[in-house]
Amino acid sequence: MIRVGINGYGTIGRRVARAVSLQDDMIVTGIVKTKPDYVSMVASRDFKIFVPDKSYEKAFQDAGIKVEGTVENLIDDSEIIVDATPEGQGEKNKDLYVKRRIKAIFEGGEEPEIAQASFNAYSNFEEARSKDYVRVVSCNTTALARTLHPLRERFGIRYVDATIVRRATDPNDSKKGPINAVEPSLSIPSHHAPDLRTVMSGLNVSTIAIKAPTTLMHVHAVRVELEKDASKNDVIEAWRSYRRIMEIGKNSGITSTGQMMDLAREFGRDRSDLYEIAVWSQSVSVQGNHVSYIQAVHQESDVVPENVDAIRSMFDIADRDRSVSMTDSKLKIEKRVF
């Protein structure tokens, strides 16, 4: 059993903790929290609570939440740390991990240079093998890699042009925006293009990003120039070999991200998460070697399976297909067509 500590229990950290706890070959040794809030109160029922340092202990004790120790105590009891702290904090934390000689996974908000490899389970599982420091790429990059990898593998890719309509913030965040505006990123390509190349080496790609006043999901409009001609059926069949890509058909009645998240609720998933990248089959258009499609991305959860697979790769205990199958089985990710 791999002993996994979770430093940071926000949107990603709490989901990774849950996913790790479901695996047969891993155990959660504890989580690090900074505030004795409602999240800490609920989490303390399932996980041991640790704090960044002793100065945080009294606030937790006053709230009636037992503290097991500091992050250094958690490191002592773990073999790897998943650092899901806010963007930029992981870089500060890395010094401690290096000093204590413990493996660590960082999330996509950190710069690629923080790690020895960036990671996506489908496109570059082997690059994280036996590494000490790995970065799981962002939700948007994960989504693009998921659907582009099968196309590159089967047809080859000459060029990708993706427009990313980003959600403004997560559902539980009442501080960020925009609330009543559309906010384009004026840097073209957006940061997603170079980030995608960290897990799909040499890919010729450009991206445009636009923030929209919604909290539910991102939406991508993707245009791909393949190296060889394909049909619409060829493209869809390539995706159907991968469980983490979900085909949404006309008969589903799903035409919005609101309905897409309602589908996740109907699955009965923990936190109503949709780990899969949902591609509207009606949107798939193929003319010769040019492919266009639209996909929806649940930014809170699509990177969660990747974190689990990254752990196995770093400890060299499974190949890609076996690890992905193990993870998918526990998270109830199945081949689905709607």
UniProtKB/Swiss-Prot annotation:
Binding-site residues for D-glyceraldehyde 3-phosphate, renumbered to this chain: S138, C139, N140, T169, H192, A193
One GO location term (cellular component): cytoplasm
CDD domains: GAPDH_II_C (cd18127), GAPDH_II_N (cd02278)
Coiled coil regions in record: none
GO annotation, biological process: glycolytic process
EC top class named in words: oxidoreductase
Annotated pathway: Carbohydrate degradation; glycolysis; pyruvate from D-glyceraldehyde 3-phosphate: step 1/5
GO molecular function annotations of the record: glyceraldehyde-3-phosphate dehydrogenase (NAD+) (phosphorylating) activity; glyceraldehyde-3-phosphate dehydrogenase (NADP+) (phosphorylating) activity; NAD binding; NADP binding
Active-site residues annotated for this sequence: C139 (nucleophile)
Cellular localization per UniProt: Cytoplasm
Principal cellular location given in the protein's record: cytoplasm
Annotated keywords: Cytoplasm, Glycolysis, NAD, NADP, Oxidoreductase
Catalytic activity annotation: D-glyceraldehyde 3-phosphate + phosphate + NADP(+) = (2R)-3-phospho-glyceroyl phosphate + NADPH + H(+); D-glyceraldehyde 3-phosphate + phosphate + NAD(+) = (2R)-3-phospho-glyceroyl phosphate + NADH + H(+)
Pfam name, any one: Gp_dh_C
Record-listed NAD(+) binding positions: T11, I12, G109, R167, Q299
Presence of the UniProt keyword Cytoplasm in the record: yes
Catalytic activity, EC: 1.2.1.59
Assembly, per entry: Homotetramer.
Family per similarity comment: Belongs to the glyceraldehyde-3-phosphate dehydrogenase family.
Database matches in NCBIfam families: GAPDH-II_archae, PRK04207.1
Protein name according to UniProt: Glyceraldehyde-3-phosphate dehydrogenase
Organism: Thermoplasma acidophilum (strain ATCC 25905 / DSM 1728 / JCM 9062 / NBRC 15155 / AMRC-C165)
Taxonomic lineage of the native organism: Archaea, Methanobacteriati, Thermoplasmatota, Thermoplasmata, Thermoplasmatales
Gene encoding the protein: gap
